[in-house]
Swiss-Prot record:
PANTHER family: MATURASE K (PTHR34811:SF1). It comes from Galbulimima belgraveana (Northern pigeonberry ash). InterPro entries: Domain_X (IPR024937), Maturase_MatK (IPR002866), Maturase_MatK_N (IPR024942). This is Maturase K. The keyword RNA-binding applies. Belongs to the intron maturase 2 family. MatK subfamily. Keywords: Chloroplast, mRNA processing, Plastid, RNA-binding, tRNA processing. It comes from the Eukaryota.
Length: 509
């Protein structure tokens, strides 16, 4: 970041914040390469993603040389004019992927610089992980049971690709970079569908994930500007204010350029935003708005959101996309869980002298359930079982070594079990464990051309059991039975805050 900031400081007077020349710098592609390695899909090894050869230094140098020779073709290119386009012709997938990844790194620079300056001005401790998943779970535990209404909101999608370009104009004041952005948007014509609320970030193509991730975040950044009035002084990873729930790449700079716009148009409705009982949380394309207020207040918020998105951002949002429900009678799907607030009724007997009383009490309890049908559907899509949940062998892994097969199955199970350990009922996790364990056994038996029974008898079922429950054994060592009985780990809800994203298999609806 210091190198990028220095570059902009040196050339600020003569280039007017031009970011386009950075495409000709080799370290940009090195940064994109490092990000690709750190953000790989959790159940695939690095070599399967193609990063080892595609992002090598030699290929980056060849790409830069070719761009120097055909600089004008990068911007004025037409997707249909393949004869004039040698840049995207023979190595279209390779070079286009590298340029899009490098371009995503470059357009993030203005956001990053504003983030650093904001952190320095406010003297807030820097954190490498300011993502909503770290604060949403404590919010669910501490606050949700005290609220009355919740609204399910789907982030609207732009009706035209040019809106995405116009959104970035206030951040990127570089005409060549904006033209290049238009080129990528039209080259990947399916990007419009990737921004739709029904699509998730995890469904983005592996080759251009960072590019579309940046576009998605910038789009949602604008959509969430309506909630800027909910913010109080910035908090640092606390679940008591709206600021901690925003899943932003650049966290503390939200209000700098967004506060002025809505005030001019919605002065009469500013009182709506000062309700201290409003809570907003979002992950990817889905968000919730919860309140302790009345149903009328939620209806006013619904009307405001629809009009704000339609008339200010030209985003089509149908009113029926925002559902208002009572928490005590409704469960909502969010962050890979079905969440609800239930009333636990109990009777307390009280005795005073010779008189006794029966007191009916009700306690609100927050419950989370892992969705078994979507999880089995995800496992079936990945060929671990059929649609009925019956385990099958993973034939494409049969050529791998035994240790590699065990490691892959073990990693998938630990990731799913790790994340869904917050479920109130563990029977669903036992079902997932059974599917993956038997699928692993069938895969190994197929490799050795034997039956599952024969293979398990030779290998020993305890080895598979020990491998797939390694995390539970670690917990039993950390918490002795005298102070934290091991059986409670199967009954207690545990949130692991070191998870920075929902795994692909845990994120399908």
């Amino acid at each position: 970041m210091e190198e990028l900031q220095g570059y902009l400081e040196i050339d600020r007077s003569r280039q007017q914040h031009f970011l386009y020349p950075l495409l000709f710098q080799e370290y940009i592609y090195a940064l994109a390469h490092d990000h690709g390695l750190n953000g790989s899909i959790f159940y695939e090894p690095m070599e399967n993603l193609g990063y080892d050869n595609k992002s090598s230094s030699l290929i980056a140098k060849r790409l830069i040389t070719r761009m120097h020779q055909q600089n004008h073709l990068i911007i004025s290119i037409s997707v249909n004019d393949s004869k004039q386009n040698r840049f995207v012709g023979h190595n279209k997938n390779l070079y286009s992927q590298m340029v899009s990844e490098g371009f995503a790194v470059i357009v993030e620079i203005p956001f990053s610089l504003r983030l650093v300056s904001s952190l320095e001005e406010k003297e807030i401790e820097k954190s490498h992980n300011l993502r909503s998943i770290h604060s949403i779970f404590p919010f669910f535990e501490d606050k949700l049971s005290h609220l009355n209404h919740v609204s399910d909101i789907l982030i609207p999608h732009p009706i035209h690709l040019e809106i995405l370009v116009q959104t970035l104009r206030c951040w990127v004041q570089d005409a060549p970079s904006l033209h290049l952005l238009r080129f990528f948007l039209h080259e990947y014509g399916n990007s419009n569908s990737l921004i739709t609320p029904k699509k998730s970030i995890s469904f983005f193509s592996k080759e251009n994930q960072r590019f579309f991730l940046f576009l998605y975040n910038s789009h949602v950044y604008e959509c969430e500007s309506v909630f800027v009035f909910l913010r109080k002084p910035f908090s640092h990873l606390r679940s008591t204010s709206f600021g901690a729930f925003l899943e932003r790449i650049h966290f503390y700079g939200k209000t700098e350029h967004l506060v002025v716009v809505p005030r001019n148009y919605f002065q009469k409705t500013l009182w709506l935003f000062k309700d201290p009982f409003m809570h907003y949380a979002r992950y990817q394309g889905k968000s919730i708005l919860a309140s302790k207020g009345t149903h009328l207040l939620m209806k006013k918020w619904k009307s405001h959101l629809v009009h704000f998105w339609q008339y200010h951002f030209y985003l089509w949002s149908q009113p029926d996309r925002i559902h208002i429900n009572q928490l005590c009678n409704h469960s909502f799907y969010f962050l890979g869980y079905f969440s609800s607030v239930r009333l636990n009724l109990s009777v307390v007997r009280s005795e005073m002298l010779e008189n006794s009383f029966l007191i009916d009490t009700s306690i609100k309890k927050f419950e989370t359930l892992a969705p078994i049908i979507p999880l089995i559907g995800s496992l079936a899509k990945a060929k671990f079982c059929n649609v009925s949940g019956h385990p099958i062998s993973k034939s494409v892994w049969a050529n791998s070594s035994d240790s590699d097969i065990l490691n892959r199955f073990g990693r998938i199970y630990r990731n799913l079990s790790h994340y869904h350990s917050g479920s109130s009922k563990k029977q669903i996790l036992y079902r997932i464990k059974y599917i993956l364990r038997l699928s692993c056994a069938r895969t190994l038996a197929r490799k050795h051309k034997s039956t599952v029974r024969t293979f398990l008898k030779r290998l020993g079922s305890e080895f598979l059991e020990e491998f797939l429950t390694e995390e539970e054994q670690v917990l039993s060592l950390i918490f002795p039975r005298t102070s934290f009985p091991f059986y409670r780990s199967h009954r207690e809800r545990i949130w692991y805050l070191d998870i920075i994203r929902i795994n692909d298999l845990a994120n399908h609806e």
